[in-house]
Structure formats: structure tokens, C-alpha cells
Amino acid sequence: MLNKRHKYLQIAFNRSMEEVQSMITLLPPSDRIIIEAGTPFIKRYGVVGISSIKSWWGQKNAGNTYIVADLKVMDRGATEVALVAQAGANAATCLGLAPVETIDEFIKDCAEAGIDSMIDMMNVEFPFEVLQKLKRIPNIVILHRGVDENVNNREKTLPLDQIRRIKGAYNNILISVAGGETTREVMRTFFNDSDIAVVWRSFYENPENTTNLAEDFLKLAK
């Protein structure tokens, strides 16, 4: 599982199976890289896609893999959690906008399946209040500025102010920040004490430049 003393780069993949395989082979080996099977990728390829990503990254990274299945669960996630865990995922996501009962069940299901629970707080105005309502705390909270928000609402900033508040109350929680795509934004993310920075657009738009992009972002994950 993840080390609280480390910073991580999470790369989300949403291209075709063949393209994702090619891009993963271009990644530099690193224990700081997390591979995400993005929601569109999972919808297209299902658990076969997840197990394939696990295999490709394992071959490239000497078996050292951490795979996130971006399920975005909103209701009754038990079956989905079990399926992705069996396929080799190390973590799965549930939306913070889901009912509290659903989030509680999701966290329990992940614990029983032996994988990390990640709660995605996209479009949640007060993430801390969601956490206060839960029976148990997730392993990871994702503070998320969505893709459409990035494109259509440039005034929407990354919710970095939430990081220290959450960490101040929950010592064992990890914070992931999604929605910052430039090296400057990723640097700010880590400066504000996030544990994980999620990127995808640069890799999606420039798959042939995967190696250089990963190396540049990894320099920030110190």
C-alpha cells in the first residue's frame, strides 16, 4: 500500500487498450507512480482492462504496482468493488456526493476486499462535513476540480485550502488532488501537503511524450 512519507504521481489512462499498453511501456520505473484505469477505460474494457494494466505495469515496474479503478460509485458498490479487487486493483473510488449510507458501505466493502477506499469530493462544497458524517474514514480523499470545470469555468480553483483542515482532523488520511494539469499546479498541490497529484490530459494529448512528461512530473514528487 501507499507510504504516508512519500509523494505520488497518479496517471489516469483513458485511451484504447493498445495505446494504453504502449504508453505504460514508455513510463520510467518508479515506486512513486500510481496507475489509474479511468472511468471511460473501465466502461469500455471492464475488468479485463484493469487486469491488463496491472500486468503491463507489473512487467515494467518489477511487480511494484498500485492500480486505481475509477468507478465513481454512487449506489450499491459492493459488486463493483469485489470485481475490480479480483482484477488486481489496489483502490477504487466512490463519489462524495453519494448518500452517506452508500459511502459507509463502500468503505466497508473496500476494507473487506483488501483495497483502499478513495472518496472523490468533486462538486462537494464542504468535504470536511461529509467526512464528519461517516462511520469510518476512507483511506484517501480526492479533492477534485472536474474536467468540464477546467474547460468552462476557469475561475474555479483547486480546493487546496481543504488539505490542511482535513489532515489536521484525520491523521491517517491521504489527500489526492485532481484537476491540476500543469507542472506549476502539481508543484502547488505538493507544496500544500497533498500526498497524490492526479494528471491525465498531458498524457492523453501527447502519448508519444509519455516518458518525458512522467519524468518532469516525478521531479516534483519529492
Tell me the role of every PLM-derived stretch.
Residues 1-78, 136, 211-216:
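Conserved N-terminal beta1-alpha1 strand-loop-helix module at the mouth
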Residues 7-13, 33-37, 67-71, 92-94, ...:
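Hydrophobic faces of well-ordered beta-strands that scaffold small-molecule active sites
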Residues 23-27, 53, 84, 110, ...:
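Generic structural signal for hydrophobic
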Residues 29-33, 56-64, 86-91, 111-116, ...:
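Glycine-enriched alpha-helix->loop->beta-strand junction motifs that scaffold or abut catalytic
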Residues 106, 110, 191, 200-222:
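C-terminal helical cap(s) of enzyme catalytic domains, especially alpha/beta-barrels
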Residues 139-203, 211:
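Active-site/ligand-binding-proximal alpha/beta "capping" segment
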